Amino acid sequence: MNELERRFIAARRKAIELDYQRLNPMQREGVLTTEGPLLLLAGAGSGKTTVLINRVANLLRYGRGSDTEEIPIPISEDEAAFLEQYIKDPQEEMRPVMQYLCAVQPARPWEVLAITFTNKAAGELKERLERMLGEEALDVWAATFHAACVRILRRDIDKLGYDRNFTIYDTDDSKRVIKDILKDLGLEEKQFPTRELLSVISTAKGEMLSPEEFCQLWEQRGDWRKTRIGKVYKLYNQKLREANALDFDDIILHTVTLLQSDKEVRAYYQNKFRYILIDEYQDTNHLQFLLAGLLTGPHGNICVVGDDDQSIYRFRGADITNILSFEQRYKNARTIRLEQNYRSTQNILDAANAVIRNNQGRKGKTLWTQNGAGDPVTIKTCYNESDEANFVVGDIMSRYNQGANWRDNAILYRMNAQSNALEYAFKRNAVPYKIVGGVKFFDRAEVKDMLAYLCVICNPADDLRLRRIINVPSRKIGGASIEKAQAIAAAEGRPLFDIIRVARKYPELKSAAGRMEDFGQLIMELRSLCDELELVEFYGRVCQMSGYVQMLQEKNDMESRGRLENVQELASSISAFLESDPDDPSLAGFLNDVALYTDLDGQSDSDNCVTLMTMHSAKGLEFDHVYVTGMDEGVFPGNRAMGEQEEMEEERRLCYVAMTRARKTLTMTNVRQRMLFGQTEPKMPSRFLEEIPAENMRWLGKPEPRKALQWDDNWNDSWSGGWGSTTRGTYKTQEVKQQTRQKPLQHTAATRRAPAAASAPLMQLSAGDQVRHSAFGQGMVLSVRPMGGDALIEVAFDKVGTKKLMLKAAGAHLTKL
């Protein structure tokens, strides 16, 4: 290479760089590195979408021009001098010549495949490209994995024996097919829930296991149930094939199979797509990983964008090793780290960096910003979930009074059931809010079902609620029979319940009369128990005797487990109601209280409201002020992660995602004790809080000396005898030496758990007794109100004023003086 060629290549690179001078150096490098495999490790808030857009634009304008020493056109001193002059004084009229001189095999739009994870992201990519480049950008293949695969299959699925005009079955279609198969095989849906079967089949397809391989695997292991599921899987595939239909898993599976089995088809697409870009690569599963490799031709021009520290969808099949092993899969791969953050303050980033640094399975990067230090992260230790909710809502109200908008605030939690106490506090204070990616607690179907049971028990004349739950769970009382009973009730001017109780009197109800009367007897038995039992315990009986809990337990899929948690969480609402010292602490009083707050749900300004969501739902979003609640061991990280390194690292990544949603302030809360799913347990701070450096946070209400809780392993997953009890496991506290921030508290199963012991009897207290509380200090008991197997006590504390506490829950923290 002579001097002129060196000058030209250097000038060409600098001229192209001028188009992207507004990008930071690493972003610019990600745009201009066009050839070969490239891993873009894009930290939270680092502007990865901007890099993707500009990278595609660069490929269409200049092709390999920024990343090659090739000179495809004859050059002279004039061409080199022109580019050097353009660099010194770029003029718009010079651009056409500059682009001609700098372009080396510019890509045509249809030669670029950009894979995103959502249709919205694909649409945004095309829209921004069109604004930048004009209509030619619309021919870029910007699509989700499924959409891209459908286009491939519409052209070539006949090679697999399908007609190109295949049908795509959605989840409801697949459910109907499974239900028909269960009938054909004589299998009960209770034993083989449809959702579970579809989940198992989906997993098998994701692992590229055919029905025959699946059956053989589980026959060898002697698993009768899985072998039966294998037969369902086989018939399911047959029925879809007969209907010339694919489900969502088939779309990618058949594309991979096609590309693996047909060299001509594979070569066609490898030649067609000169450049492949895949966003959110950390969330890809095994099939998507295989597909990416099959589409990448000999040129090896695959660019994957992702953040291993934000891989949080393992439960959906995402495999973090896809991004961690990218450089091993593509030997000559280059890696560029996007570490400059444009969203958060340095204190927030330092805290998040410190937390995620404890993970071993990561590539490693450190986020930084020019936004300034900002406020330290606030950690607040509250007494219980009600205090936590009141603190968060109070803080948000304070910001609002100082001029902030409601919409500037977001509250994140690990699981949907945690929204209950927060919603109660928002409604009580008339603060507008919305739930994203979920349904408000009292609007959830299972919660409405249980409230309907309580309403009918309280008022059997409530025909509306009665019709809702008479056949939930199924009692084989058909809709036609209910309509007949309703007609009789209307003719006689009596409530529907009166007819149901004596259904055998009416010949037209003969087919369902016995089952109707059984239901009526159930309601009457529960009505008699209502006055005998404390309200929380009574609710537990309703859940058991109605068969509702058993119904959810038998389904035993992810959705049913979530619904079961919500049914359990309603017990927490009842306890919170009782602790609020209501005028009418009866079932009727609770139902009135619920009705009042649910009626306040409608908001006049749906846009300007506080956002509540799970941490998973928050991915990709950002807010000025973020509150991360439930930072307790056993809640976050959850108990399922204890002792499982991969699960624990996934939880830590989820914490990192939650923390990096915040722009200006980040507040994280934990409690000393939490009632969740109807059970109250003492809590210790999440290990993730302990991993935040002292210089980046302020901890309000932190107990000194620090207490560590040791738990037994006897978590009571059944509900027999569990209602209204203080804890599912016993605990003890032990003094722990103060440790430095640089060396976080070490957590192991051995130090957190202790052997189970019998539940301690209730402390005997009377009005006038002096007590000391570990959080509230010294105080005097004002009143003691027995409540079933518990008691509600009112204590006037010297420092914090009057508090109402359930004695079972508070007993561990109280000492009688």
Place the predicted regions along the sequence by residue.
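Helicase P-loop NTPase motor core
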Residues: 49-52, 67, 75-76, 81, ...
